[in-house]
Amino acid sequence: MSKTLLSRIKPLSNPHASNSFRSHLPITPRIKKLVSDTVSILKTQQNWSQILDDCFADEEVRFVDISPFVFDRIQDVEIGVKLFDWLSSEKKDEFFSNGFACSSFLKLLARYRIFNEIEDVLGNLRNENVKLTHEALSHVLHAYAESGSLSKAVEIYDYVVELYDSVPDVIACNSLLSLLVKSRRLGDARKVYDEMCDRGDSVDNYSTCILVKGMCNEGKVEVGRKLIEGRWGKGCIPNIVFYNTIIGGYCKLGDIENAYLVFKELKLKGFMPTLETFGTMINGFCKEGDFVASDRLLSEVKERGLRVSVWFLNNIIDAKYRHGYKVDPAESIGWIIANDCKPDVATYNILINRLCKEGKKEVAVGFLDEASKKGLIPNNLSYAPLIQAYCKSKEYDIASKLLLQMAERGCKPDIVTYGILIHGLVVSGHMDDAVNMKVKLIDRGVSPDAAIYNMLMSGLCKTGRFLPAKLLFSEMLDRNILPDAYVYATLIDGFIRSGDFDEARKVFSLSVEKGVKVDVVHHNAMIKGFCRSGMLDEALACMNRMNEEHLVPDKFTYSTIIDGYVKQQDMATAIKIFRYMEKNKCKPNVVTYTSLINGFCCQGDFKMAEETFKEMQLRDLVPNVVTYTTLIRSLAKESSTLEKAVYYWELMMTNKCVPNEVTFNCLLQGFVKKTSGKVLAEPDGSNHGQSSLFSEFFHRMKSDGWSDHAAAYNSALVCLCVHGMVKTACMFQDKMVKKGFSPDPVSFAAILHGFCVVGNSKQWRNMDFCNLGEKGLEVAVRYSQVLEQHLPQPVICEASTILHAMVEKADTKEPVESP
């Protein structure tokens, strides 16, 4: 309803005299009987309009004159609407000249919250220039405020103030104050409160308390106290309700010291603390971890003859958990009973939640069953931690059964509970089960939200199932569930990953069209798509649009564009973007530098590649497996740079960077291709100032007649094992065996020592070297002596003991014991 509409409705001359119409119509016994008979006729007679005309034909009083009393007595709003329509059409002139009758009808509509009808009636009254009472408009304001219609409530309030130069009645104003505070519009609430104080006696204690509570909830406790002093005087707090509000405000701020001062003050002034007072203080001390103080207050509650609330005890148990105290669940239940309280659902929820966090799922289930046996009805907070715990341990069958059990026990799973299970299924890759769970959710009357759709679409996109993801997006729109920014970003990225950039562009355009706040993530996804499609000009244009929209390009933005130019072999532009990135104070990351290193390597400019590698280290950036693999792959392609490839292989071991299969194969391929001549220089200590373990082993094996490939393979394993990466060494060996490469004595020696390095020597029994024989073991011992020059004495002793025991037992079938 617009202010223009309201401005056409005129007030009665005396707004505060809400019953002034009765002055010209005394409520005589005859009037009372007419009103009662009319209400009865309206309720019981089909042809009530004709009957009323007949009844009032011979009466001195017109029906319109008693209609305000009739509307006040009617309890059925439908009858009231019919009566209003009849009066508006059949007795229009008489009816609309009586503002009291229209006002009473408006009060009836407000009482039953018939807002559409209220709007229509106010529209009609505007056209008829009808006078309305202050009381009726106060009722309308109260109805709007209690229903949460803030804009309408404020509109009515402003109209009343403008029209009557007074605020609506105190009940209506208090409802508006409550709504403003709830909506966190404290400034507007304070304005209304001040007008209530300035314009007559339209403020009561509840009005002040509403605003003070709002101030305290927002952390403005001192402002709240000044508000109290402004009304009752300095240092004066009128009653226990205000004390409780102030104490609650301090506790919420974590200012337990001031809260306790106010608590002592109220007792000194003769006020009796209530259970709420004690509960707030106990909770405050619990949050601080001061359980001595909370126990002292608990004793005071008992001394004063107040009944201890289980809420107090629950807070103490929960706080002890949060502060790291060891709490026995069974003892906690006994403690509550000893305090003449019964454990409630909240008690069990606290215990179940904590047990699940401690990994004691089965014990938690026992407490859930115990709660049910005691007649308590578990809720979503009872089941959600259990479902989450079982999902975390990948026991999805049990999690699903718990969901069914919830329904059987009369607890309807909410969107959060379903979301936990769906998230667990998605993370574990059980996408079909996750989608089916969404279907069950809908079948049980729970509507999925944007977060659940986002989870499902993200999981589908990651597993390459883009069509189902697109169908889910369409379903979302069909169900009028507005996709949020994350949903759009997930779908855009999914289509780009699948190579369907056209579809990604459509989704991006749709997000803009729907008014979604497109952020850096969305633009980065599009930039990735442009770069993958070789559309680098469009990628730059997208980054420029980000600047125009006041979005700051991040490391991903620049790194993606740099990588795009590197792949186009346009290093000049890639470096230009890199410098622009630095100029805009966006620090390059490992991905950025790795892209540049790759670009230089592709051009054969290994000098610049190595300088870039050094620069990233000087900036405290740690090269990752992709960085090292990029260098090793390129350097291993040429005989002249193969030695440097070995250097970076050993450097990544030294820096605790675990190589992957690609790194391993790239290095070996360098040796496979070099079938003649020296592939590595003799170790002379000039390799960047370090001796090369790889080179030492490689040349030793070559001199013993091993092939380049076998020597390189074993040398790589030796490096891994010496640096404690025996698990990776075993994985590479398994893959080589599957390719037909048989294990040899040197591999055995390397991996045996590797297990000893990590303190797991017993694992050598699982190694597949059963056919080494006596000669093979002798070879293993010989190479172990070389290997032991690079290992600490305890490792040497342990490995040597195992090897010599194996040699001694070589001619028997007696098993060798681990030392």
Curated annotation (Swiss-Prot):
GO cellular component: mitochondrion
Annotated signal peptide: none
PPR repeats: from-to residues: 98-132, 133-163, 169-203, 204-238, 239-273, 274-308, 309-343, 344-378, 379-413, 414-448, 449-483, 484-518, 519-553, 554-588, 589-623, 624-659, 709-743, 744-779
Molecular-function annotations in GO: sequence-specific mRNA binding
Keyword terms: Repeat
Pfam families linked: PPR_1, PPR_2, PPR_3
Keyword hit for Lipoprotein: no
Gene Ontology biological process terms from the UniProt entry: mitochondrial respiratory chain complex I assembly; mitochondrial RNA processing; RNA splicing
PROSITE patterns from the UniProt entry: PPR
Keyword Repeat applies: yes
Superkingdom, taxonomy of origin: Eukaryota
NCBIfam families: PPR (TIGR00756)
PANTHER family referenced in this protein's UniProt entry, alphabetically: ATPASE EXPRESSION PROTEIN 3 (PTHR47932), OS10G0484300 PROTEIN (PTHR47932:SF2)
Similarity section: Belongs to the PPR family. P subfamily.
Protein name, per record: Pentatricopeptide repeat-containing protein At1g52620
